Amino acid sequence: MSQATASEITDEGVIESVSGPVVTAVDLDARMNDVVYVGEEGLMGEVIEIEGNLTTIQVYEETSDVAPGEPVENTGEPLSVDLGPGMMDSIYDGVQRPLDVLEEKMGAFLDRGVDAPGIDLEKTWEFNPEVSEGDEVSPGDVVGIVPETESIDHKVLVPPDYEGGEVTAVESGNFTVDETVVELDSGEEIQMRQEWPVREPRPTVEKETPTTPLVSGQRVLDGLFPIAKGGTAAIPGPFGSGKTVTQHQLAKWADADIVVYVGCGERGNEMTEVIEDFPELEDPKTGKPLMSRTCLIANTSNMPVAARESCVYTGITIAEYYRDMGYDVALMADSTSRWAEAMREISSRLEEMPGEEGYPAYLAARLSEFYERAGKFQNMNGSEGSISVIGAVSPPGGDFSEPVTQNTLRIVKCFWALDADLAERRHFPSINWNESYSLYKEQLDPWWRENVHEEFPEVRQWAVDVLDEEDELQEIVQLVGKDALPEDQQLTLEVARYIREAWLQQNAFHDVDTYCEPEKTYQMLTAIQHFNDEAFEALDAGVPVEEIIDVDAVPQLNRMNTQEDYEEYIEELKGDLTDQLRELY
């Protein structure tokens, strides 16, 4: 966050009243969304309403001890983030203050009114130019490359709001982010650092239809409810159903180039877990530490409410910057409900007319404004990049009919409904296969056919049909018991049980099972389908269900998930199933 210096202060006003994070000031010459510094301590705030001589400000810090009569200083600039090398492997708060830098200055408990630039202004980076003198460049073009971390090459771009022109001077070597590395004949100078307002989407040429899946390594997601690179997904669920673990799994194993993890109003311990785990884990694609492709934005539940509102925008702006370089970015927002609650609190302080359940009337507009910044895009420099947004939703009491869940459902195309009953039964990830859906299936099917197996969509549909049939039979089973069913339906229930227990269940804390590649996901499902086909043949030949499920090879289906050398194991298992079941008749 760029710090306002004395020369940047354009006007001063006076505080008239303070109500929690909302402060009103008089005699302040300001525009909407200007950043202001409030009170003697210079607390950062943002103008959210102007009425006559009264300016309303939401303050991004605790406002206790702020009194009427204290000054308010206007910077005349909108809330912006610093974009440049150094953002990977870093942790920020909701307004892009680097928490690790501030901790070194003042320990674990931060004082109010402190600030630090989002990017280290003194560190030097190796700049390798990609343009020469005399080259024509336009907004969005790559002018140089900086090795930012072991796994990420940071591309220095012509800022989107520049005119562009002919390169008149270009430097090579080590520079700080504020030193000029390229000069243009238009008089414009390009540094490695640029600023961008968080509420304004960065421009692109066009939005494209996503056709590649974001492979997560979670069988239930990749197999049944896939999300595309550039897609949007919501993970609603009651407390303790596994939202955060699912988000962590996606942040760890999703095949995105960059991960931006926004902890928005959730527990601090969960962010601590991310900070401790990620540096030790390897990226399956590069073998480098996961942290080297991750940017964390921590705005935990005990941090000021107003900053929750900005942290989501800070995260998506950083994601857009890396998308402009041609990277596939995954953004996790945990949890959008806390963001909506922050909006509700600010709205009620402003005495606005409440909408449903006290949320502001513009809740749907704000949610869609955020999710619509996701997508697969053609960038201004001709490259393609994507942002996939996965938002957790925490409906009180697990009630999916509340406004945040319902408005999110209208916007996203992928719905992963977490179920408290499944979580209580220790079925994880506890994604309810009857309530969840993905609208990306059809547009991703060609990719699965080409890259995994041409019959993948058909095998998946078979699994869905079996699970649907099980759901219909469960009502009868609860009334009369399983033994009263015809034998073919009893066998269907057994097959469905293996789909649930051997395929859908996955252990996030097992070294092998935590990540399941698409090929293994398919092979495991075909093994269960093979058991289904052979078992029904045995049943048709007059073999009782009890004998079929007592065959030694059948329980081996539950061990497929933990096999590293899975191809050999599954091939052998299919052979054993065939031999042992055919011996029965």
UniProtKB/Swiss-Prot annotation:
One of its GO terms (molecular function) is proton-transporting ATPase activity, rotational mechanism. Coiled coil: none annotated. The keyword Transport applies. ATP binds at residues 237-244. This is A-type ATP synthase subunit A. Its EC number is 7.1.2.2. PANTHER family: H(+)-TRANSPORTING TWO-SECTOR ATPASE (PTHR43607:SF1), V-TYPE PROTON ATPASE CATALYTIC SUBUNIT A (PTHR43607). Keywords: ATP synthesis, ATP-binding, Cell membrane, Hydrogen ion transport, Ion transport, Membrane, Nucleotide-binding, Translocase, Transport. Has multiple subunits with at least A(3), B(3), C, D, E, F, H, I and proteolipid K(x). Belongs to the ATPase alpha/beta chains family. Its main location: membrane. Component of the A-type ATP synthase that produces ATP from ADP in the presence of a proton gradient across the membrane. The A chain is the catalytic subunit. GO terms for cellular component: plasma membrane; proton-transporting two-sector ATPase complex, catalytic domain. It catalyses: ATP + H2O + 4 H(+)(in) = ADP + phosphate + 5 H(+)(out). It comes from Natronomonas pharaonis (strain ATCC 35678 / DSM 2160 / CIP 103997 / JCM 8858 / NBRC 14720 / NCIMB 2260 / Gabara) (Halobacterium pharaonis). One of its GO terms (biological process) is proton motive force-driven plasma membrane ATP synthesis.
